[in-house]
Curated annotation (Swiss-Prot):
PROSITE patterns: NAS (PS51142). GO terms for molecular function: nicotianamine synthase activity. It comes from Oryza sativa subsp. indica (Rice). This is Nicotianamine synthase 2. Its EC number is 2.5.1.43. It catalyses: 3 S-adenosyl-L-methionine = nicotianamine + 3 S-methyl-5'-thioadenosine + 3 H(+).
Length: 326
C-alpha cells in the first residue's frame, strides 16, 4: 500500500508540473512546444496506475479539472487545424491518415462496434446519433463507413464552426456515405423528441466536462431516448482521468439505463467504453439491472470479470477466452 501511495504521489507531482508548464503557454494551437508538452502528459497518463482521481485532495482535484479544460481546448485547436488541412484536398476522405491519431479512432470505433453487437444482441441500428462530434467526426465516420453501412448518422455539436468543418470533409465523398452523415448545431440539452428516434446514441468524452454536467446529460438522454435503445459512452479510467472526465456508472444507472459492459483499454487507445441500454419496462430491465452484474472487459479480453452494481462485487462465471480484436 505504501508503495502504491508513493507511486500515486509521484504521478500527481509529475502531472502538476506538466499542468504548470501547459498553463504558461501563450497559445494552445499546434506547435512544437505544445505538441511536446501534451505528448509528455499523455505518456504519463496512459500506463496502468493505482490512482483513483475521484479520491484526490481538493488542490489536486482543482488542478485536474483545469487540466481537462486545457486538454479540451488543445484538442479543439488540433482538430480544427487538421480539418482545415484536409479540406484543402479534392477528396478529404482519402487523406484522413494525415491526422496523427487517426489509427486510434479506427481502433476505438471497431471496439465500440464489437462491444455493441456483443452486449446488445440482435441490434441492427438504422438511426444513430453522435453527440459531441466536433470538426473531425472520425468515430461516426469510421462506424458509418465500415461497421454500420445501413445506418443514418446525425452528428450533434454545439459549435457551428466545428460542424461546418466536418461537412467540408465529405466534399467529393461517395454519395452513399455522404448522404448518411448529417451535422446539426445543437446542445444535447435542447433535444427531446429527436432522441426517441435513435437506436443508438454515442456520447463523446468531452460532452459534460464536470461530473454534475455529465450526470445531467445522461439523465436528459435517459428521459428522452426510446426504451431499449443503446447508449455508448466514451470515458476515462485511472490516470487517464487527468486528460478527460470520468463517468460514474451510478450516474448512468440513475439516468434510467442498464449498464451492460465496461471496457478499460491498456494500449494507445485512451478511451474507456461503456455500453448501456435504456431500461425497457416491457422486458423487466436488461442484462445488468440495478442489482445485476456488469462485465468489465479486461484487455485483451482474455476473461471478463463481473462488477456488481451499487459498488458491490459478485463472482460470476468466466467467459470464454475469445479475443476481442482491437
Amino acid at each position: 500500500m505504501e508503495a502504491q501511495n508513493q507511486e500515486v504521489a509521484a504521478l500527481v507531482e509529475k502531472i502538476a508540473g506538466l499542468h504548470a508548464a501547459i498553463s504558461k503557454l501563450p497559445s494552445l494551437s499546434p506547435s512544437a512546444e505544445v505538441d511536446a508538452l501534451f505528448t509528455d502528459l499523455v505518456t504519463a497518463c496512459v500506463p496502468a496506475s493505482p490512482v483513483d482521481v475521484a479520491k484526490l485532495g481538493p488542490e489536486a482535484q482543482a488542478m485536474r479539472e483545469e487540466l481537462i479544460r486545457l486538454c479540451s481546448a488543445a484538442e479543439g485547436h488540433l482538430e480544427a487545424h487538421y480539418a482545415d488541412m484536409l479540406a484543402a484536398f479534392d477528396n478529404p476522405l482519402d487523406h484522413l491518415a494525415r491526422f496523427p491519431y487517426y489509427g486510434n479512432y479506427v481502433n476505438l470505433s471497431k471496439l465500440e462496434y464489437d462491444l455493441l453487437v456483443r452486449y446488445v444482441p440482435g441490434i441492427a441500428p438504422t438511426r444513430v446519433a453522435f453527440v459531441g462530434s466536433g470538426p473531425l467526426p472520425f468515430s461516426s465516420l469510421v462506424l458509418a463507413a465500415h461497421h454500420l453501412p445501413d445506418a443514418v448518422f446525425d452528428n450533434y455539436d454545439r459549435c457551428g464552426a466545428a460542424n461546418e468543418r466536418a461537412r467540408r470533409l465529405f466534399r467529393g465523398a461517395d454519395e452513399g456515405l455522404g448522404a448518411r452523415m448529417a451535422f446539426h448545431t445543437a446542445d444535447v440539452a435542447t433535444l427531446t423528441g429527436e432522441l426517441g428516434a435513435y437506436d443508438v446514441v454515442f456520447l463523446a468524452a468531452l460532452v459534460g466536462m464536470a461530473a454534475e454536467e455529465k450526470a445531467g446529460v445522461i439523465a436528459h438522454l435517459g428521459a428522452h431516448m426510446a426504451d431499449g435503445a443503446a447508449l455508448v459512452v466514451s470515458a476515462r479510467h485511472g490516470a487517464r482521468g487527468f486528460l478527460y472526465p470520468i463517468v460514474d456508472l451510478e450516474d448512468i444507472r440513475r439516468g434510467g439505463f442498464d449498464v451492460l459492459a465496461v471496457y478499460h483499454p491498456d494500449d494507445e487507445v485512451i478511451n474507456s467504453v461503456i455500453v448501456a441500454r435504456k431500461a425497457d419496462p416491457r422486458r423487466g430491465g436488461g442484462l445488468a439491472g440495478a442489482r445485476g452484474a456488469v462485465p468489465v472487459v479486461s484487455p485483451p479480453c482474455k476473461c471478463c470479470k463481473m462488477e456488481a452494481a451499487a459498488g458491490a462485487f459478485q463472482k460470476a462465471e468466466e467467459f470464454a477466452a475469445k479475443r476481442l480484436s482491437v
